[in-house]
């Protein structure tokens, strides 16, 4: 997979996850900075997931690939100087994955990956990535219940963000609707478009 990605775009879920990981390794090598956000991974990885499912990838395969990515996120440890370590000590460095929310047309954006990411969090209970769930009035009850069960495990995730408050607030600050509706979270709770 790594050899292929050196010269060709990803086609499968496994390849797309590996390409995503390469991006974050490069960012860390170049910037040694915290709070790089993978964003709405359940949206941009979904076409690769669907393609792979039609080619025989099982739920178990997809979960294992996702869990491997979650483990990789926990391998990066940010080196801080003594001044910033007093204020920002601790392991997490703010890789925030946003799931759910809505599409540009206002319909529900959750998909199989939204649930898969919740399951990976429930099984691993790792501090990274920060997993955030975007909700709104049309979020499926099943998704809310799945998230509630994961929250009940005590990892503090997923964090909950209300699209019905966030999107209008971003638009009130001059962010175009198509950008506001695709917001993600950086670090702990900071919004980005």
Annotated model-derived regions:
Residues 1-193:
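Conserved catalytic cores of very large enzyme subunits
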